[in-house]
UniProtKB/Swiss-Prot annotation:
Disulfide bonds: none annotated. This is Aggression-stimulating peptide. The lineage of its organism: Eukaryota, Metazoa, Chordata, Craniata, Vertebrata. Its main location: secreted. Stimulates aggressive behavior in male frogs. No effect on female frogs. It is found in: Secreted. It comes from Leptodactylus fallax. Expressed by the skin glands of male frogs.
Length: 25
């Protein structure tokens, strides 16, 4: 459903930000 899509998108964003942050360390 829409909520599941939003949660999936949020997880992707969080993962991307986390990866970028780790690479900068």
């Amino acid at each position: 459903g829409l909520w599941d899509d939003l949660k999936a998108a949020a997880k992707k964003v969080v993962s991307s930000l986390a990866s970028a942050a780790i690479e900068k360390l």
